[in-house]
Amino acid sequence: MSTKQKKTIQKGSFKRLLKLFFFKNKMLTALMLFSIIISAVATALGPQYLGYATDSIVQDMSNPVSSNIHWDRFFFWAWISSVIFLIQFVSKWLSAWFSTRIISDTAKELRSQVETKLWSLPLNYFDTNSHGDIMSRTTNDIDNVVTTLNSSGADTIYSIFQLVGMIVMMTAINWRLALITVIIIPVSGWIVTLISRFVRKEYQKQWYYTGMINSNVEESVNGHNIVKLYGQEEKFVEAFRKQNRLLYESSFKAMAVSNLIQPLSRFFTNLNYVIVALGGALRVISGQMTVGDVQAFIQYTRQFQTPFSKLSQAYSSLQSGIASLDRIYELLDSEDQAEEKPEARASYRLQGKIDFRDVSFSYVPERKLIEHMNLVVEPGQMVAIVGGTGAGKTTLVNLIERFYEVNIGEIIFDDKVEIHDLTRACLRENIAMVLQDTWVYKGTIGDNLKYGLKREITEEEFRNACRETFVDQFVSTLPDGYQTVISNEMSSLSAGEKQLLTICRAFLVKPNILILDEATSSVDTRTEAMIDQALDKLREGRTSFVIAHRLSTIRNADVILVMENGHIVEQGSHKELLAQNGAYAGLYQAQFES
């Protein structure tokens, strides 16, 4: 990505955040801005009225005729100043409250947008992006944006108004001294901008490497058994060290250089303070200013450091926030899955016949995975798909579920319904899957079994399904039975028991189309037999596609498809394909001999 494109993204991201921040709740925003303006005006007026109080004392003390001090005038100006500072306190607190509410709403909206976006992304987004990086964008980056808004939100706006108010008041007191102060600001700001450009690049690297570390940790946690089995701990540790070192370097550079900004701003502010103190003293001697004016001006100069430093600090913090914001909007701007046809049916019961007509598909244009495939599957048929890695087995079933869209050709159901004539939700209500990688969510076994059900079922129907799929056999031995809490990360269930759960889940859905990824290699013989029986019951009367890894399990398939490089090279029953003595016979013989 070019530098120009990056700048465009950064500006666009920041504008979108401002729009979200200011216009999500216009009433709260208006109240916040009103409170900030009142607070800034009160802050600007306070020193001036204290100067009036000082002048009243100095004038009385220097009066050659009478040395009486008019305390009533002094206390009047002091009382006015106190009221102003009280107003400043209340309005500042209100602005902070409104700001916190707006930031919370903004964070909530950002998280909602990201969550909604994740469900609208096509499957290839998750196939081509690391899951750790996606998690980092949805958690770490949003948290960082919220932190940036908290540190650079209302305070930044307040500091701007405060600076403007102080400049106006200083100009009213003495425009020459005010000009010196105003000249120093752009010089300091220009230097801060130069530093911040470097800081932003390092913050972008920092959040990128944070995503990489998350991916590394996710892989090591999910596959820790395999890593230990093959003695690859050192490899993971070394990869983590490398990424951690890169994260350290980018973070250190960003923070080290960023830490220059505030001291540098203070240096220019203190330099301005010295010039004002000397210039003011000379003007008091010459009678051009009163002592109260100098006191007020010096107080403005000293207070000038606070908003100026806050603005400098906010600008530095903003670089980290914008870097995270770019990553969030990069996710939000990713291309969605293809839109549904306006007339697509939201409810339809498929009978199970599927007709692939001249279907072609590729993830990338230069590499075709499926080319001009023609296939007719009758209702209730069991179709087994065999072939080597990359042959197109999984791609074929992904096309049936519309996880991917065909590039060319059509998929027709029941001789009359084209796949795009149904909404994705409607299509998938007719399909159930039993995958090689079983998945359960945190909840009770009962809730997991009913996951995805769109209809009410009776307790008797539920228990019958559990008995038919042998789930009741092991759940009944658990102390809490179907109320036992399980999760994907922590569970007392074996791999085979989890597979039986997913089979029962599919059984309860009562689909007319099944997709089965053969997954019995990691279980014992007894459990494998139960899984096979449960699958046989599940397949009864349903069209099923079985991604087969062991050819001995698909002898009874109605149709066996042998795929190579996206093409169906052989098609027929087990006996027919063996008789042809082709690719299938070679695969079968190889497995039999092994």
Task: State where each predicted segment sits.
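Membrane-integrated ABC transporters
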Residues: 1-46, 58-80, 95-99, 103, ...
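Hydrophobic/aromatic residues in alpha-helical transmembrane segments
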Residues: 46, 50, 95, 99, ...
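Short intracellular "coupling" helices and adjacent cytoplasmic loop segments at the cytosolic face
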Residues: 2-7, 104, 112-136, 140-142, ...
